[in-house]
């Protein structure tokens, strides 16, 4: 097993910094950071409005920002509770709009720092460091790592001499793409907490679509595409000798470094775009927390020979309670509700995956100022049919392509700085229209799905596993990106996916070897064992792991106890949703909550009646006692 100690939280400090205030986050961390402990550090996304009441029935230009900020408040408040509180709650460059969303500020000793020049006056009285290291902004991360390692505090001075990197002998390596976000400071924080060396490299010049296209062209027979991908990813790491380390973690915007490095050592990845602050925090917390010891196994039985039964048996050998969504139970309705509303620590997918068909749509609309625009996008639909339900759930995903002729997300698109209200007008208008100018397409690029018994699953959710952070093994084709994004954003401890279309025999053997080791070694080491069937084959290096190297799954005491854990979580969830219903005004939101409550009650009555009665009886006895 990889020898790595799980970090502990530093309960003295809890830091929340505006996501674009990288230098400020670095200077603050130089004061409060230390080796071998992890300071809870989070980046607050940009907010365009304060937390005021509004008409939720119509999407306005602030809807995305408002929802994102409210979700951040819930998640960071939970993290603060899980960390055990703090002596000092430090806010870095949060404006009044951002602060208005934080509902817990009055409960803690609050320190508000607006810029780098204020850091020393606020933090020097509460820390014992007094040695100073001057550095330039462009050398922040390397200097920060050295400063915290040697009890220096950091001062930004762009006239300083060039910082000379100092490498320490460590077992682990953390490679950080130097994007202009606070998340890179989170990466330094993590590296110090696990006593790993860092290597800062330039940001990638390619995005996940470019990377996927390189891989697709390579697998279609163009070896130059692999060379082009390698050239992009090797920039910055070509001088590293990975044989000096036992494992490496890449903080990246999507680079599959394990592929181009041929898994020379055990490698994990952390996505810098999908809440890396919560990803690291949750991995640390749930490694030592009491888990539910529950698993979901999903398979519509698409293959004559697959790993499904083997996986179920291995998880049950570890005394996990396994809920199998297999055969005609592997429906879109079932997987959608279980992912959102069922407590689990492991989810295994065995099915077909990848891109699917849909429609291309071109529509003209007029914004609130009377200006006409043309939007081009692709639409993918799926239908969740459940016997006994009065309505059919429609899962619609739009993939934006062009706006007024500009490629969505391109440099030209960003430079145009389209106002938020135009985007909200566009979305509202598209939602209202029933008849659209649709053209069928056999393959929708960048679409992603998992084949169900009756439809396809596109992983569209914002809650998961009743706030547990599970490990996902998506053993379908092309599962490393796009469909992985929802899981990484909402919160997992680990996500294992494939970089291209995998051979079913390889997928089966690899999964079986992985679960053979899952309770005796950590997840990363179990993954190394699963590589054996791929060596020398077309699928060599096909798997990529989004996770951290210390993550483990521990066996439970008994399946009966694990099943009771699930029942208890389901009961708590139903009661929680019922409480929220009383406070909710929006009709559509109430309908969603009512459906979740109804599903939870039905799940308890159908599969956990005995356990629920026992739990409620114990609660009554406890209250009477």
Identify the role of each PLM range:
Residues 14-17, 89-90, 174-176, 251, ...:
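Structural motif
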Residues 74-81, 86, 117-151, 213-235, ...:
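Low-complexity, serine/threonine/proline-enriched polar segments
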Residues 336-344, 460-464, 483-491:
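Mature extracellular/periplasmic domains of secretome proteins
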Residues 97-98, 354-359, 481:
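Short glycine-rich, flexible loops that bind phosphorylated cofactors or substrates
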Residues 1-22, 26-287, 291-292, 303-305:
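Alpha-helical transmembrane segments and their helix-helix packing motifs
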Residues 196-217, 405-434, 438, 466-624:
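Active-site-proximal C-terminal subdomain of hydrolase catalytic domains
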Residues 106-116, 268-275, 366-401, 467-469, ...:
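Short acidic, glycine/proline-enriched helix-loop-strand junctions
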Residues 180-182, 243, 249-426:
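A domain-level signal for caspase-like cysteine endopeptidase catalytic cores
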């Amino acid at each position: 097993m990889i020898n790595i100690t799980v970090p502990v939280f530093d309960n003295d400090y809890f830091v929340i910094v505006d996501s674009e205030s990288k230098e400020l986050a670095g200077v603050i961390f130089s004061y409060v950071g230390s080796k071998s402990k992890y300071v809870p550090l989070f980046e607050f996304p940009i907010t365009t409005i304060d937390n005021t009441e509004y008409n939720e029935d119509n999407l306005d230009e602030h809807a995305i920002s408002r929802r994102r900020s409210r979700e951040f408040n819930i998640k960071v408040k939970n993290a603060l509770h899980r960390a055990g509180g703090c002596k000092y709650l430090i806010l870095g460059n949060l404006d009044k709009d951002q602060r208005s969303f934080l509902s817990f500020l009055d409960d803690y000793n609050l320190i508000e720092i607006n810029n780098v020049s204020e850091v020393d006056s606020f933090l020097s009285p509460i820390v014992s460091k007094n040695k100073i290291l001057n550095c330039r902004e462009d050398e922040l991360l390397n200097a920060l790592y050295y400063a915290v390692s040697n009890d220096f505090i950091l001062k930004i001075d762009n006239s300083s001499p060039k910082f000379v990197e100092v490498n320490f002998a460590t077992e682990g390596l953390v490679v950080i793409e130097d994007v202009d976000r606070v998340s890179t400071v989170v990466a330094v924080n993590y590296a110090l907490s696990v006593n790993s060396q860092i290597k800062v490299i330039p940001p990638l010049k390619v995005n996940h679509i470019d990377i996927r296209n390189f891989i697709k062209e390579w697998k279609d027979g163009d070896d130059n595409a692999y060379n082009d991908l390698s050239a992009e990813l090797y920039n910055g790491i070509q001088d590293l000798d990975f044989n000096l380390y036992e494992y490496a973690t890449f903080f990246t915007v999507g680079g599959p470094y394990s592929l181009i490095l041929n898994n020379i050592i055990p490698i994990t990845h952390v996505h810098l775009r999908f809440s890396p602050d919560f990803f690291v925090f949750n991995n640390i917390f749930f490694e030592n927390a009491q888990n539910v010891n529950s698993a979901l196994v999903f398979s519509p039985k698409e293959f004559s020979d697959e790993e499904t039964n083997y996986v179920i048996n291995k998880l049950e050998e570890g005394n996990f309670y396994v809920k199998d969504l297999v055969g005609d139970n592997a429906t879109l309705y079932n997987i959608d509700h279980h992912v959102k509303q069922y407590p689990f620590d492991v989810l295994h997918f065995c099915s077909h995956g990848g891109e699917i068909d849909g429609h291309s749509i071109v529509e003209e609309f007029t914004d609130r100022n009377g200006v006409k625009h043309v939007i081009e996008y692709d639409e993918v639909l799926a239908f969740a049919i459940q016997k006994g339900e009065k309505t059919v759930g429609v899962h619609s995903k739009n993939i934006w392509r062009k706006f007024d002729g500009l490629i969505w997300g391109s440099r030209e698109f960003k430079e145009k700085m389209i106002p938020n209200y135009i985007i909200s007008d566009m979305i509202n208008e598209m939602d209202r229209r029933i008849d659209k100018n649709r053209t069928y397409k056999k393959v929708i690029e960048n679409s992603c799905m998992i084949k169900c018994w009756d439809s396809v699953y596109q992983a569209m959710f914002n809650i998961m596993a009743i706030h547990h952070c599970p490990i996902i093994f998506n053993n379908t084709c092309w599962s490393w990106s796009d469909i992985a994004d929802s899981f990484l954003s909402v919160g997992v401890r680990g996500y294992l996916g494939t970089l291209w279309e995998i051979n079913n025999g390889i997928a089966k053997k690899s999964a079986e070897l992985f679960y053979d080791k899952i309770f005796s070694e950590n997840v990363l080491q179990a993954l190394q064992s699963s590589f054996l069937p791929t060596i020398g084959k077309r699928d060599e290096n096909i798997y990529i792991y989004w996770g951290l190297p210390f993550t483990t799954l521990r066996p439970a005491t008994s399946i009966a106890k694990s099943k009771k854990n699930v029942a208890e979580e389901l009961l708590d969830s139903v009661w929680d949703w019922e409480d929220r219903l009383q406070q909710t005004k929006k009709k559509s939101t109430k309908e969603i909550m009512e459906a979740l409550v109804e599903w939870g009650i039905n799940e308890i009555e159908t599969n956990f009646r005995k356990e629920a009665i026992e739990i409620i009886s114990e609660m009554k006895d406890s209250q009477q006692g």
